[in-house]
Amino acid sequence: IENSLEAKTNSLGQFIVLSGIHGEIYKDLVLPKQYTLFQNYPNPFNPVTNFAFDLPEQGYVTLVVYDIMGREITRIFDGDLGGGYYKFNWDGKHRSGTMPASGVYFYQLTANDFRQTKKMLIIK
């Protein structure tokens, strides 16, 4: 993931700042009623995939990719987010900048007391 800084305003004139991520935040929609981690797409993928999730309330959020042995590959997001729908993309690279081997990987969303993990497949 490339480092970046982006600022936007929503229809209410509120500033939204994204730092170090490529993602989209949909703040103007009605707040979700529950936490939801959606299946990444495309899946299988090479080299880019997208992650999306719903947060019903503000909280500290991590979105992390792990290999089949449970080793952390990269952190897609690590910080505070308000309630809403979020979408992030991943270029398929290890945090060191290298491409992981083809195979099964897992991504995990943790937010407040919610934790969910899903499976994905990298192909080359």
Question: What are the roles of these predicted feature ranges?
Answer:
Residues 1-36, 42:
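Proteolytic cleavage junctions
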Residues 8-10, 30, 44, 56, ...:
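Surface-exposed coil/turn segments at beta-strand junctions on protein surfaces, enriched
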Residues 11, 21, 67, 94, ...:
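Surface-exposed loop/turn motifs at beta-strand-loop junctions within extracellular Ig-like
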Residues 24-41, 45-67, 75, 87-90, ...:
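Glycine-centered coil/turn sites that cap beta-strands in beta-rich domains
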Residues 77-113:
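Short, surface-exposed loop/turn motifs with a glycine/proline- and acidic-biased composition
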Residues 114-118:
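Extracellular and select intracellular beta-sandwich modules with Ser/Thr-enriched
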Residues 120-124:
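Short beta-strand edge segments in extracellular beta-sheet folds
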